[in-house]
């Protein structure tokens, strides 16, 4: 079984770190986009989220934050 944690010959550790961070940030964006879509489609308040608009706003803030991180990562890569 191949060890996925070792550095291959064509990719430096720095490149691996940038790729990993970008994948993580993108996956977080996708997660929060799905959350917004579910909240907008369901239109039903959840017990711990009685203010649906405030909950959606919170999800949008998270999307914006991770989008900013992707942009910042591109500036330094």
Where are these regions (language model features)?
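Extended, charge-rich alpha-helical interface modules
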Residues: 2-77
């Amino acid at each position: 079984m191949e060890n996925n944690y070792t550095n291959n010959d064509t990719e430096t550790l720095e490149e691996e770190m940038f790729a990993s961070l970008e994948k993580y940030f993108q996956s977080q964006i996708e997660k929060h986009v799905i959350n917004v879509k579910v909240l907008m489609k369901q239109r039903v308040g959840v017990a711990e989220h009685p203010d649906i608009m405030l909950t959606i706003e919170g999800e949008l803030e998270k999307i914006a934050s991770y989008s900013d991180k992707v942009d910042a990562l591109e500036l330094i890569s």
